[in-house]
């Protein structure tokens, strides 16, 4: 598939732009005299919009083609990002009422989420269109690795650029989706429309997508749990002051990102391995990793546990995407990709709410639940494999 390199760059640029906001959202909220829950609202909103829009974009791309929807998505992210940067630049100068800032930031983030939902959905559907079933996991892993690089690059560069002004990273990263739009226009071929009377739309309850949806939800839920709870866990369990804990948290999250990418690179290099095998292996490794986390006795052990868990989740990500693509017909690829993508969005919504509630009961509970969840995913995968063998 000759378009894979372009898709990798497109996803890297757009993910980096999305994640750069996380590096400055806290300082922006404080500078505009807003409250911490306002930051949580703007981040959680992205998950809500993802759930709502991913299936829509997937179905739309089945009907009108992948390129127009992908181009609309990346352009929309770029323009919406410019709107966000412009408002924050304006707000930092005149300090408008908090309710106005909240409304404008929520609106801009919602628009970004609306258009971003199209990018992973259509990218995965495009791979499913172009790549035979036996090689889809490898290509999904390449795409996932590029997104992982974006997850690391965005906050790192965004934090560095913030010394030149809180709106500077937003202006800089708004350019990246516009560059991605140029790549879409120049390198992604426009496929002819398929003459079909009606494109089938897999439902949320579609039994064919049940396992990949469970895997997508649990994995994204656990990723968000790690991001939200790690800083608190470092302070409470290692008894560090806030400044040092922030540094330790940053180091651990950087290592987690590297392990996440490494796992997907390994998947991309292995040919002919069925997605179910990666799901089973990844869920087993993630179970062990989170088990180490909640039983940890030192900072080194904590970092090691998170790295093991991240490696396991890195194996799972491309597996559930390829599993979904292999489970449906050619005409259903976009809708299936959107359905599974919306399950990821649901994990983003529920993750922060459930994990912080569990943390309030006991700091180890979020990680105990994550470990049990991945153990259950392994059981579900084995059961699915047994059902396929016995036609149950």
Identify the function of each model-found stretch.
Residues 48-52, 248-271:
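Transmembrane alpha-helices of Major Facilitator/SLC transporters
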Residues 53-66, 262-275, 359:
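Helix-to-loop junctions at the C-terminal end of transmembrane segments
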Residues 1-47, 211, 220-239:
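Helix-loop boundary and gating motifs at the non-cytosolic
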Residues 275-320:
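C-terminal transmembrane helical hairpin of 12-TM major facilitator-type secondary transporters
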Residues 108-147:
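Cytoplasmic helix-loop-helix junction between adjacent transmembrane helices
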Residues 12, 94-118, 301-315:
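Hydrophobic core of transmembrane alpha-helices in multi-pass small-molecule transporters
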